[in-house]
């Protein structure tokens, strides 16, 4: 049953995941960040905060199809525009798999990410 307590727990769990992604991006020194609120999380290719659609660069838009396809290859469903939508049936294992897939993506494509963003600056 979706009680107010369960809603708060879900919000905190979702926010912790988003923060963990930003910690990953910072630790890997990659120009990416996750924003959103609660169960809606958007991945952006930028070091600057994204607060409106005009903040989304051409480089970010160019990299999103690669992120989408790479995460799908890892079994992670993400929207083609870089959005994650968390849901109540998901577990810590689901989020761990998503984070691991993002880590692989960074390891595989960090030089390309930087080059694409430079080319579109």
Model-assigned labels for residue ranges:
Residues 1-121:
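Conserved N-terminal phosphate-binding loop of PLP-dependent enzymes in the Aspartate aminotransferase
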């Amino acid at each position: 049953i979706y009680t107010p307590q369960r809603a708060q727990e879900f919000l905190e769990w979702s926010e912790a995941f988003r923060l963990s992604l930003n910690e990953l991006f910072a630790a890997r020194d990659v120009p990416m960040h996750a924003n959103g609120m609660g169960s809606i999380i958007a991945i952006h290719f930028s070091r600057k905060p994204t607060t409106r659609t005009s903040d989304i660069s051409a480089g970010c838009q160019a990299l999103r199809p690669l992120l989408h396809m790479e995460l799908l290859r890892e079994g992670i469903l993400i929207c083609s525009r870089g959005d994650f939508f968390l849901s109540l049936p998901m577990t810590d294992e689901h989020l761990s798999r998503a984070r691991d897939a993002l880590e692989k993506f960074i390891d595989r494509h960090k030089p390309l990410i930087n080059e694409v963003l430079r080319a579109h600056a």
